[in-house]
Amino acid sequence: MAAVCDICGKGPGFGKSVSHSHRRTSRRWDPNIQTVHAVTRPGGNKKRLNVCTSCIKAGKITRG
């Protein structure tokens, strides 16, 4: 599953993990993506969307 929000387009962030001895290895931080059933428009069809939790908390979708 792609780690991209269907509403805001938030995707993974990239960076380095740094150990105690300062060795650096690449890593990525994925957003908290949840699959939800949402109504596309009032009285419309339900659709399955991949949405980040910040969009769910902000009320950017109507769950159905």
UniProtKB/Swiss-Prot annotation:
Keywords: Ribonucleoprotein, Ribosomal protein. One of its GO terms (cellular component) is ribonucleoprotein complex. It comes from the Bacteria. One of its GO terms (biological process) is translation. GO terms for molecular function: structural constituent of ribosome. InterPro entries: Bacterial_rp_bL28, Ribosomal_bL28, Ribosomal_bL28/bL31-like_sf, Ribosomal_bL28_bact-type, Ribosomal_bL28_sf. Pfam families: Ribosomal_L28. The keyword Transferase does not apply. The keyword ATP-binding does not apply. PANTHER family: 50S RIBOSOMAL PROTEIN L28, LARGE RIBOSOMAL SUBUNIT PROTEIN BL28A. NCBIfam families: L28. Belongs to the bacterial ribosomal protein bL28 family. This is Large ribosomal subunit protein bL28C. It comes from Mycobacterium tuberculosis (strain ATCC 25618 / H37Rv). The lineage of its organism: Bacteria, Bacillati, Actinomycetota, Actinomycetes, Mycobacteriales. The gene is rpmB3.
